[in-house]
């Protein structure tokens, strides 16, 4: 297969050909109990074990025919030029508010001593105060902030590559993320598409950029087919960002003709739409039953392009299967309940990402092995399930879909 563009994602289930991952690194060893909440973790993964599990995830994708790229390697290659690297450091330090803690100049000087690979590892891992040469403290803020160990916070959530940017069609969104702990993450993708040889010559459309004032995250963005995108209105994604993205998609000659804005409960357990709802085949979906009302009802806003790109028709609907059938042109859909629909099992397995499947072809998904009830439910419906070990990976509260950013999928025949 000849790829004429580096980004091509017109479905959730097309055969996966290129995907971007981030191998967990030293950033996880900069987690401590005191700062877990600040850095959006509930526990501290054991690094050698989580790396082994992640390597098995990557190997599984390769065995299924996918090219695996790594965020850290792409970023380093994009920053090969010294001037671009210095520009990146300036932008990163500004966003990290390094000027507030008085360390901007020292951090910049420190980071410029590294080659691109080492510098990228350093900023992803975080910079502890004791890593810089000690100087006599003379400013009040220096004396008072000694208890906090970092000049630059680590980025332990980076192995969830789904969220900072998301491919839609031939372009992508580079997202303004909600939480300060993750906001710097999308800067890497901006530099990759602007400066990496694989991407920079292709004029890749950016449907929504990270400087937009409202939040959106990739875990809420699902490409259902070449004309339809579902986006979660969630704890992390705002209605305002969705509306702007819809207008940009309609006005900029994308193939997208409709967007389903799916409201889900705003809680950490249901962080993104893909933690409670994913597509596994042309007409089959996993769903966590707790996002629906007693009668299976929920709020779904269908935004459709009118006769002109500026004209948007919005309707509110409440029956997810009916909306999916109509918008995807299906005679029927099958919703497969996480945990088999059992109240306890579904809550337990959803917490460990039982609904967060990664489709690598129609009817073929990668899942966590610990969600054995959900996996069996998928198999009973004819889905091929490829399980990966998850004892440490799942501590980060994200599953196979969260840990992957598809860049190229073959079209669904």
Curated annotation (Swiss-Prot):
InterPro entries tied to this protein: Arg_deiminase
Subcellular location: Cytoplasm
Active-site feature positions: 402
Disulfide cross-links: none
Catalytic activity reported: L-arginine + H2O = L-citrulline + NH4(+)
UniProt keyword terms in alphabetical order: Arginine metabolism, Cytoplasm, Hydrolase
Pathway connected to this protein: Amino-acid degradation; L-arginine degradation via ADI pathway; carbamoyl phosphate from L-arginine: step 1/2
GO terms assigned for molecular function: arginine deiminase activity
A single GO cellular-component term on record: cytoplasm
Record bears the keyword Hydrolase: yes
EC number: 3.5.3.6
Record-linked Pfam families: ADI (PF02274)
Entry protein name: Arginine deiminase
